Amino acid sequence: MISASRAVAARLVGAAASRGPTAARHQDGWNGLSHEAFRIVSRRDYASEAIKGAVVGIDLGTTNSCVAVMEGKQAKVLENAEGARTTPSVVAFTADGERLVGMPAKRQAVTNPNNTFYATKRLIGRRYDDPEVQKDIKNVPFKIVRASNGDAWVEAHGKLYSPSQIGAFVLMKMKETAENYLGHTAKNAVITVPAYFNDSQRQATKDAGQISGLNVLRVINEPTAAALAYGLDKSEDKVIAVYDLGGGTFDISILEIQKGVFEVKSTNGDTFLGGEDFDQALLRHIVKEFKRETGVDLTKDNMALQRVREAAEKAKCELSSSVQTDINLPYLTMDSSGPKHLNMKLSRAQFEGIVTDLIRRTIAPCQKAMQDAEVSKSDIGEVILVGGMTRMPKVQQTVQDLFGRAPSKAVNPDEAVAIGAAIQGGVLAGDVTDVLLLDVTPLSLGIETLGGVFTKLINRNTTIPTKKSQVFSTAADGQTQVEIKVCQGEREMAGDNKLLGQFTLIGIPPAPRGVPQIEVTFDIDANGIVHVSAKDKGTGREQQIVIQSSGGLSKDDIENMVKNAEKYAEEDRRKKERVEAVNMAEGIIHDTETKMEEFKDQLPADECNKLKEEISKMRELLARKDSETGENIRQAASSLQQASLKLFEMAYKKMASEREGSGSSGTGEQKEDQKEEKQ
């Protein structure tokens, strides 16, 4: 157990009395920089970073993801291989072990619900025992399991995957989208996270980037990124609120924009509130109504539930622009009396009634954020809406009532976050020079002290990066080591907050309690990730302490997952190569058979039979295409093409000679006719 040194505390008080408040702040480990000085240091730091190549901005969303890059001074959102500007954050594993990402995964979810993962961002950095995870287990068709480290992982076909891995598969798709556009490898990235993510969730997101093969230069908050997208070309100084209600999380941030400086004043939110909850609420309503009308309970039928889930999401989206929608699902299920169909009309008012409590849950964080930023709603010059759920009229009305002004539609709610991430990438690369971002830590950071009390060292909404040191001592005579538990949260007792990890400082010289002086430094970097170091002031010996959390991914875990991801990438490349070769082969077969039929009178029968044998061999090869390489199929197809070209060349020559013969014969007859006329 540790305690604050009484002697040191007394000296600190004395120093404060004799030297004034500034000295006291230096004495207790405060860095002593004024706000303006901090800004100058930040600018110098940005300018000194040398980043080679393009930096992509990625919004790794709960429901959809988006990628953007800077083109000159403008950010450009990129289209994926399917031609869409956003990609569903869905990953599926088929029975034969194939991995699908994005829309192909979403399309097959109805027939493969148990092995199709969606909204796994809600699990990232979370323990299996978290109440939110336990709630999620009841709502999703796939298996959420306890990993060996106690984290929540998912299972498909007997294989376990961490949420960071699933996120990495989505990031690989975004990376591929960027590379297809850029024409070269995309290595560096800025990835966004919900502002209210804790240290474990931020670290797990960085891990996802590493697994996908990306160098994550910075993790930035989603509302802050959206503010960058909004304010990049604005010259007016103002305070703005960013209301971000996405697929899985809710954030509210209050920012001040002043001469290119984007300073976050406060942030708040709920990491388990979003569009998925709206879908789930509507799904429960539909299932309840269906049971009332037919007596059939759909909760035991995963395939039927997946169809209802997709219909609920579609209805939710339609009701943003229509006052009523129809939900029609024929042959949804069956009982002894025959097939059962779902036919239901749903009005906007009904839907709003179903989700009213969810919308209300966004109000308290907004009020708290304004209170922390010390602003009233009259001080806020603009309210920016981010996230797909903000298209819902009831949400927009709630925001208007809350802030006393109609929200701005200046940014695309689906793309603003990725655009902001790309802008921050431009800042880090030195391409954007007139922007400075000052973000904050969303949660207080501290340690557990005697009696299980949570002692805060860095308060929430402190501008990051930041550092704070404090002197601790032993709680017992002769104590040679101290255990320090690092927590994050706002509750009074340490046990009620998120335990980030704990470490033990050993090798303290035996002494009476309260005598050893151990200076512990807590450091939050620009990604919002926590680092801790300690120094024994008595011996002058300094030690770097690595927080050993009982959860999270180890270095070996990440290395294995990187190899796994590379294996999948190689498999994807081979599959693509094989598909392209098969398409080429089938095209050659079709063209060859068409030409053989067209020129059958000019082709020698024995040569035709040989070519037909070649085609049969090619078809046999295509029948076992899954076990063949793309190169083998391509070579066989090229061989068939060469053989067919030789044969058709023979046919062409024969036709040409026949035409020549018939032409000369016709000329002779014409001359005979002319002779007869003269006679």
Swiss-Prot record:
Interaction with FXN and ISCU as annotated region, ranges: 432-679
Organism domain of life: Eukaryota
Subcellular location: Mitochondrion; Nucleus, Nucleolus; Cytoplasm; Mitochondrion matrix
Activity regulation statement: The chaperone activity is regulated by ATP-induced allosteric coupling of the nucleotide-binding (NBD) and substrate-binding (SBD) domains. ATP binding in the nucleotide-binding pocket (NBP) leads to a conformational change in the NBD, which is transferred through the interdomain linker (IDL) to the substrate-binding domain (SBD). This elicits a reduced substrate affinity and a faster substrate exchange rate. Upon hydrolysis of ATP to ADP, the protein undergoes a conformational change that increases its affinity for substrate proteins.
Alphabetical list of SUPFAM superfamilies matching this protein: Actin-like ATPase domain, Heat shock protein 70kD (HSP70), peptide-binding domain
Phosphothreonine modification, residue list: T87
PTM sites of type Omega-N-methylarginine: R513
Record region (Substrate-binding domain (SBD)): 442-679
Binding partners and assembly: Interacts strongly with the intermediate form of FXN and weakly with its mature form. Interacts with HSCB. Associates with the mitochondrial contact site and cristae organizing system (MICOS) complex, composed of at least MICOS10/MIC10, CHCHD3/MIC19, CHCHD6/MIC25, APOOL/MIC27, IMMT/MIC60, APOO/MIC23/MIC26 and QIL1/MIC13. This complex was also known under the names MINOS or MitOS complex. The MICOS complex associates with mitochondrial outer membrane proteins SAMM50, MTX1, MTX2 and DNAJC11, mitochondrial inner membrane protein TMEM11 and with HSPA9.
Family per similarity comment: Belongs to the heat shock protein 70 family.
UniProt name for this protein: Stress-70 protein, mitochondrial
Gene giving rise to this polypeptide: HSPA9
